[in-house]
Amino acid sequence: MAPASSNPGPYSLPDKDEVQLSAEDDWTRVKDRKEKKRIQNRVAQRSYRSRMKARLGELQSRLQAHEEQKAKEEAERCDPSPPSPPSSSATGLHLHTTPPSGNNAGANDTEPSSINSASPPTPPDVVGDLDPSQHAKAIDQFSHQMDMAGNDDSQWFLDSTSLLQHGDTSSYIQPSVPTPPVSLSQCPPMPAYMPEGPRNPNDGPASLSQSILQDCLRFQIQLLAKINNPSEATSTTHKEEGSAAKSPGALQQSHWSSCATNPAAAAQNMMPSTNMARGNSFSVLPADFHNLDDMMELTSTGDLPNATWRPSQQFSGPETTPRSHNAENPTQQQSPINDDTPSTTQHGAVPDCYNAFVAKSSAQASSLGMEERLEAAIEGLEALGFTSVDSFAEAYYSSSFDESSHLAAEQSMSRKRRLPRMLSQILDSAQSWDPWDRRGLNEEVLRTAESLLVAEGKSMDEKSLEASISGLMQATEGSSKPTPPQQNVTGMKRVLQNELPNLWPVMMALAGGNRASRQRDRSNMVLAAILILHCSSKMTKQKLLEFLDVCL
């Protein structure tokens, strides 16, 4: 049983003395260690979700209060009644905590040291038109409060590391609020402050709410990154502050252009995938392989050390096109913050977290050899759900696609042209393999050839063959010469070639190895062998011997 604490973590277990647990949630009755941890994980997750729902409800109510206050002030400005004395809320930004302390002191006089660790700092309430300097000052004060709360190990900021103490993360449900990455290298660069530019007077409460939520998400991510990696966070913060002091407008335009209209989608993009939580970096298939056949041919050859990396120009990360599209059409990507969907796009699209792998591959393009390229390709296929390269090739050639799609046309072209050439190169390369390695391949080739020849023999037109044999025998009996006319033998060979298009060339290849001086025409020997296979049970022994004597 987890020890009780006055300041529990995000995933701590509830106190049994304060909460009445059901029989199925009481882990003290279970003796098995794994089952006990499973129950504790379930109870901790349920407690965490309930706290987060309450927190989200509180934030939603506060946002609604901000919107109502803004609408009320706009209505008062439009009212021609005598102006009332300006209130303290209309002169600047107010910083307050939730729940409020007992006194009614001004929010601007709130000290960072007076923040209670049980209640998180909240973003400033923008209730008036302020210049950028005042807004930046308020934001810096709020950032300092966030740092103080982080040093006190506040329970309001998510930390995924404490969850790992209760078991495997694969069985956990994704929280309703996206968990920020544990390192600054996994999240996009963020400015130290974002000055508020001149707003359009026509902007309503919706844009105000998005701005508040945007600042809140940004400071939470920075604080978590600083807690998990203090050295990296300090160096990155200094760099960001210097760049923001030089050109804050450029930083705001470059990074927040797409997030300003859709903060919920931006928060979802920052959430790491399950593979990142397990410690596996996500990777994708390098685009240097122009098709599947090229990659399969490279895996079958032995010239891996001599090959070099050739980065393809057609590969580009998905950050440019989808994000610019989202900026133009923000309504198509709007989603609630408490959505439990994983951080992957629809229609089988690759998640955004593979940009790190793309950057790493591009940076090391000159030093990567063929083995590194193939390893990266295999890692990318495994990350996309394929167990191996073989399963990917099997799915590519055996799947049925829409006839109008580009993939169907590419698959058809590969089946007709590239697949036979690839199989031929693999079989040629197999001659240099170890005997135990190529044994299975040779056996499979023989089984395939056997089934193909058997099916061909069953589908042969026996009536046409019998008619040709009867005509040949009648011509032999009616002729004074011991051998039948040449045109009859040639006609029978043509019939067998049409009926047995695979067996005839195989028999011709086998007969080519026997170069006896008395056998001038190998086709006659092949004709006799095929007739023995297919006609030995349909004629008497005397007839068969006479026919063989005619052919040979």
Curated annotation (Swiss-Prot):
| Chain intervals for the UniProt region annotation (Disordered) | 1-132, 169-209, 232-258, 297-349
Q: Where in the cell is it found?
A: Nucleus
Q: Which UniProt key words apply to this protein?
A: DNA-binding, Nucleus, Transcription, Transcription regulation
InterPro entries, sorted: bZIP_sf, Sec_Metab_Biosynth_Reg
For bias kind Polar residues, which ranges apply?
Answer: 98-119, 169-186, 298-347
Q: What segments bear the compositional bias annotation Basic and acidic residues?
A: 64-79
Q: What is its main location?
A: nucleus
Q: What does this protein do?
A: Transcription factor that regulates the expression of the gene cluster that mediates the biosynthesis of the lipopeptide antibiotics leucinostatins that show extensive biological activities, including antimalarial, antiviral, antibacterial, antifungal, and antitumor activities, as well as phytotoxic. All 20 genes in the cluster are up-regulated to some extent by lcsF, with the exception of lcsL and lcsP, which are down-regulated.
Q: What is the recorded name of this protein?
A: Transcription factor lcsF
UniProt source species: Purpureocillium lilacinum (Paecilomyces lilacinus)
Protein's gene: lcsF
